[in-house]
Amino acid sequence: MSLEYRSALIFGWEAEELRRKMAEAESEKRYEYVDKIYEQLDKSNFILDINEDFLYVGKVISDCDIYDNADTIFIDEINFKEFAREAYEQIEPLKEFWKPTDPPQLIHFCYVR
């Protein structure tokens, strides 16, 4: 298995509480519950690293290999209201399991997939 190093920019949330629920359910062998969450995640934009150390949900602006030439994104050209609307749409399928308590944020991070 080859590892891929990626860089992502997302307008959304770190869904730490949801990630912990998934890890706890998996450790308790409640696989049906975990599968239900994954089914809903598949209806959303999300990024989960290979070790499942973090989970981000929202409007994915950019997600590329760190060796690729990513598109240039100018902060002053971002329509935050539109991205917020899209971010909230992305969490709609997950509301049975998790709801954010804060507004979405612009988050940049690197991860391994």
Where does each model-flagged region fall?
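Short, low-complexity polar/charged micro-motifs in intrinsically disordered terminal tails
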Residues: 108-110
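Acidic (Asp/Glu-rich) sequence patches and key acidic residues
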Residues: 1-103, 112-113
